[in-house]
A protein has these predicted regions:
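A "functional boundary" signal
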Residues: 1-264
């Protein structure tokens, strides 16, 4: 198990971690097969329960989440199935959940206009309370991807950053302290406000709740690497980028931003 945490000898530790990363890269196919087998298992379960809307919706939702960051085109198929189930069942919560998940899929694949159209049609005042975080998180995903796509010189950067600050603030407030995502989004908010020391404390709290080898651990480790860079902790930054890259490979996540930063 590999986790982004402090060590007394970063240079030596980083050399070991890079060797582990090289080994993971060589065995990338193994993790992809493991991922595919897990998705196939979920698909078989979904077929078994195709006449049970509740279980079928839940399994389709899991399949979409597994495909997210891995093979988004396939995720749309199961998103469509859940839209059909939600409409047939006249289940408002399922329909909202499907719309929010769909918006994230769209913004992740660069379809920003379509993603925003979905979110703009949702009235947050009538949204079920348990979906408030997902709503703000979907907007955060949209503006975060827009910010990355636009690049550092875009005249829209300030607008996107202001929007991000709003949705970071709304997202963490929709959760209770103790929820893992509370600390992740509070850390994002700290970063926007240039409160980097507090951002580090909160992302560390989030990382403690994630399992190495998962997409969430990769995200948390990458966020910590960004914070370490701002704080001047260069060796720790490299460690966290390596941990993030390892978790990306083990979870078969295709985004690989940490790998790109390590190569630059």
């Amino acid at each position: 198990m590999f986790s982004c945490k402090k060590t007394d000898s970063y240079p030596d530790n980083n050399e070991k971690l890079l060797r582990i990363l090289d080994d993971k890269i060589k065995n990338k196919k193994y993790y992809e097969i493991k991922k595919k087998n897990h998705i196939q298992k979920l698909k078989k379960e979904a077929l078994l329960y195709k006449n049970n809307d509740s279980i079928s919706y839940h399994l389709n939702n899991l399949i979409v989440e597994e495909y997210l960051g891995y093979q988004c085109d396939s995720a749309y198929i199961y998103s469509d199935k859940n839209k059909e189930i939600a409409n047939r069942s006249n289940n408002e919560i399922w329909l909202y959940k499907n719309l929010l998940q769909r918006s994230v899929l769209l913004s992740t694949t660069g379809l920003f206009v379509e993603s925003k159209e979905i979110l703009d049609k949702i009235n947050p005042e009538v949204l079920p309370k348990q979906l408030r975080f997902s709503y703000n998180s979907a907007y955060e995903c949209l503006y975060s991807n827009l910010l990355d796509y636009s690049g550092g010189d875009s005249p829209y950067n300030k607008i996107y950053k202001n929007k991000l600050a709003d949705y970071y603030n709304s997202a963490y407030k929709a959760l209770k302290p103790g929820d893992p995502f509370y600390y992740l989004f509070l850390s994002h908010k700290n970063r926007i406000e240039n409160n980097w020391s507090q951002a580090e404390q909160n992302v560390n709290k989030f990382l403690k709740t994630t399992l190495p080898g998962t997409r969430l651990h990769a995200i948390g480790s990458f966020c910590k690497a960004v914070i370490d860079a701002k704080l001047g902790n260069i060796d720790s930054q490299e460690s966290c980028l390596i941990y993030s890259a390892i978790s990306d490979i083990e979870s078969s996540t295709k985004e690989n931003r940490s790998m790109q930063d390590l190569a630059s």
